[in-house]
Amino acid sequence: MSDSLRIIFAGTPDFAARHLDALLTSGHNVVGVFTQPDRPAGRGKKLMPSPVKVLAEEKGLPVFQPVSLRPQENQQLVADLHADVMVVVAYGLILPKAVLDMPRLGCINVHGSLLPRWRGAAPIQRSLWAGDAETGVTIMQMDVGLDTGDMLYKLACPITAEDTSGSLYNKLAELGPQGLITTLKQLADGTAAPEAQNEALVTHAEKLSKEEARIDWSLSAVQLERCIRAFNPWPMSWLEIDGQPVKVWQASVIEDATQSLPGTILAATKQGIQVATGKGILNLLSLQPAGKKAMSAQDLLNSRREWFIPGNHLA
């Protein structure tokens, strides 16, 4: 029975907390929780606990917050729990080989893509930006590489034309616990069937940067619309007008050809702000000037029509 396994859980953000909650709700025996140290947050920079820590303390679980698992004394914290398996979900710390080898059944990880596609830090965003038709979660046996371990279980879900990173995150946060609980059952009863990753199919999901989210009008309208959805809700695609950053929350693609230079404003109406791109026209629907709330193109035109005069060029 998987509920008889002694489980260490290691995770930090809300995505991880949802997996911990599923384990506890389904009656699994979580003997200890590792999460990152409290971090300053908000305007007051007050130290705030991670969502995983909040949940673990609510449930009366032992919580450990080492800055690193490299020191011997921190590795001993893991060893002393005598776990059968360690479940790792968006923990954010490297697990040395000594830690990976401690649990009887090793360490398993929930990854937000269908490996070997999109190894790395930003699989959800990269799958959207690439225009993938589907994504999912992979439960894998961890090794010393970055998302290189044998695959134990996969669950797929389609990516719709309306999906943002936020909506896809929520979908995978529902799928992940399902796959995790199934995998734990298979590990417990000896039916797990590890499958090596095909190195020929590997792609890498590099960490996102705010500068990368700046709209590059030389790209096609299709690429830019995907980028806007991929970077929503963070770091948010943006453009610069009058020296001010303006976030773009939503846009649509107009397939019409245009001879105008990329970045040229073609029209500004209540239906949207149409801008020439490297191929096709991008119709900006929802924007957020610095210090303001997100608003429709029509509302922004009512207050800042001078920003969007047809023929002008956006940086």
Swiss-Prot record:
Residues passing through the membrane, by range: none
Query: What top-level branch of life does the organism fall under?
Result: Bacteria
State the UniProt keywords alphabetically: Protein biosynthesis, Transferase
Which reaction(s) are listed as its catalytic activity? L-methionyl-tRNA(fMet) + (6R)-10-formyltetrahydrofolate = N-formyl-L-methionyl-tRNA(fMet) + (6S)-5,6,7,8-tetrahydrofolate + H(+)
The residues the record assigns to binding (6S)-5,6,7,8-tetrahydrofolate are S113, L114, L115, P116
InterPro entries from the UniProt entry: Fmt, Formyl_trans_C, Formyl_trans_C_sf, Formyl_transf_N, Formyl_transf_N_sf, Formyl_transferase-like_C_sf, GART_AS, Met-tRNA-FMT_C
Any one GO molecular function term: methionyl-tRNA formyltransferase activity
User: So what EC number does this one have?
Assistant: 2.1.2.9
One cellular component (GO) term of this entry: cytosol
Keyword Cytoplasm on this protein?
no
Q: Which Pfam families match?
A: Formyl_trans_C (PF02911), Formyl_trans_N (PF00551)
Q: Which CDD domains match?
A: FMT_core_Met-tRNA-FMT_N (cd08646), Met_tRNA_FMT_C (cd08704)
| Family named by the database record | Belongs to the Fmt family.
Q: What does the protein in this record do?
A: Attaches a formyl group to the free amino group of methionyl-tRNA(fMet). The formyl group appears to play a dual role in the initiator identity of N-formylmethionyl-tRNA by promoting its recognition by IF2 and preventing the misappropriation of this tRNA by the elongation apparatus.
Q: Which NCBIfam families match?
A: fmt
Protein's name according to its UniProt entry: Methionyl-tRNA formyltransferase
